[in-house]
From Swiss-Prot:
Catalytic activity field: 2-C-methyl-D-erythritol 4-phosphate + CTP + H(+) = 4-CDP-2-C-methyl-D-erythritol + diphosphate
Name by which UniProt lists this protein: 2-C-methyl-D-erythritol 4-phosphate cytidylyltransferase
GO molecular function: 2-C-methyl-D-erythritol 4-phosphate cytidylyltransferase activity
Enzyme class: transferase
Gene name linked to the record: ispD
Lineage of origin: Bacteria, Pseudomonadati, Pseudomonadota, Gammaproteobacteria, Pseudomonadales
Length: 236
């Protein structure tokens, strides 16, 4: 890892509702240790000295953001989100271009509901990818036995996990390359699940940088309960 870490922009797509949480508000606005999940997800970036600025993509009718203290942070700029993650990220990238950001600038895209990113993981990602020609993402090697199933839920085979990784965020790519990949994939009606898949579709191979397994995304109620319990155990 390089001793000198590159400057970067952060993009947080936060226009989703998180239906699987079955909560009274979008999951990023649920409480975790006195702050919302979203605030925790932002903090690791806002505390970093190499941050150039942060763009958050929000639902047009979002009623929660303005009440958060961080909404007044001058380093954070708000844009309207899209109907899908890729559209929300693309809107943020277009905003960065309009603000004069360079195609060669690094952009880190992070899930709004991934509140446990460690500073050490962020620094490691920045250092490992500083000179990478493509970029990459935090990820964790698969640990459990993996099964491939048919449409009825019956096991077809056990998958070799030795080369299987779970994709996490942040995902770090050059602004211009990511902008082109997302825009082209949308025009071609390609299903894009994360930024790395857009770069893959464009013919590039992102690098996997191993991170901590506790950098989880809150998707179901038990995920939030696990994080709350963990914070209690460690006194945070």
């Amino acid at each position: 890892m390089k001793d000198f870490l590159p400057a970067f922009w952060a993009v947080i797509p936060a226009a989703g509702i998180g239906a699987r949480m079955a909560a009274d508000r979008p999951k990023q606005y649920l409480q975790l240790g006195g702050l919302t999940i979203l605030e925790h997800s932002l903090l690791c970036f806002l505390d970093h000295p190499r941050l150039k600025g942060l763009v958050i993509s929000l639902a047009v009718d979002d009623p929660y953001w303005a009440a958060l203290p961080c909404a007044k942070d001058a380093r954070i700029q708000r844009v309207d989100g899209g109907s899908e993650r890729s559209g929300s990220v693309l809107n943020a990238l277009l905003h960065l271009h309009a603000q004069g950001a360079s195609d060669n600038d690094w952009v880190l895209v992070h899930d709004a509901a991934r509140p446990n990113l460690a500073r050490s993981d962020l620094d490691n990602l920045l250092g490992e990818l500083a000179d990478d020609p493509v970029g990459g993402l935090l990820a964790v090697p698969a640990r459990d036995t993996l099964k491939r199933a048919d449409s009825s839920g019956r096991v077809l085979e056990t998958v070799d996990r030795s080369l299987i990784w779970q994709a996490f965020t942040p995902q770090m790519f050059r602004l211009g390359a990511l902008h082109r990949a997302l825009a082209d994939s949308l025009v071609s009606n390609v299903s894009i699940t994360d930024e790395a898949s857009a770069i893959e579709w464009a013919g590039q191979s992102p690098r996997l940088v191993e991170g901590r397994s506790d950098n989880i995304k809150v998707t179901r109620p038990e995920d939030l309960e696990w994080l709350r319990q963990r914070r209690t155990e460690f006194g945070r």
